[in-house]
């Protein structure tokens, strides 16, 4: 009988202390109005002519007009084998890498494209999305 009381008291204590725990579920996350993904396949010989840097400058200039509830996300795969593909966020403060892949891959591979898009949707949820595919 004493063991049963101890078990019941333990279960009761666990229920009371964990019942008030509040997990934030997916619906409670603040949604942006819009998330735009610029998918840049720039792994080509035009990288040497500073097109990439020009594109970056243009995006930074345009980001000055974004509101706080809009996301401009960039996936970039460049010619350099030293610089792995990455995802960056562009806003009024500039461009900041938020994910760098550990290895190079073909950015046109449909499974990799799907992986990138799913990562962006999960990390930058929004009411609506846009995708812009860039290549030279």
Task: For each feature predicted by the language model, list its residue ranges.
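Well-ordered mid-protein domain cores that form the structural environment of catalytic cofactors
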Residues: 123-136
């Amino acid at each position: 009988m004493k063991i049963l009381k101890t078990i019941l008291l333990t279960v009761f204590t666990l229920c009371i202390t964990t019942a008030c725990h509040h997990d934030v579920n997916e619906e409670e996350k603040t949604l942006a109005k819009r998330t735009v993904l610029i998918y840049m396949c720039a792994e080509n010989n035009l990288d040497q002519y500073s097109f990439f840097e020009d594109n970056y400058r243009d995006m930074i200039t345009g980001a000055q007009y974004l509101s706080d509830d809009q996301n401009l996300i960039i996936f970039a795969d460049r010619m350099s084998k030293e610089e792995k593909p990455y995802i960056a966020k562009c806003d009024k403060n500039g461009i900041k890498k938020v994910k760098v892949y550990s290895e190079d891959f073909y950015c046109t591979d449909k499974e990799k494209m799907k992986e990138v898009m799913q990562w962006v949707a999960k990390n930058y949820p929004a009411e609506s999305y846009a995708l812009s595919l860039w290549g030279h």
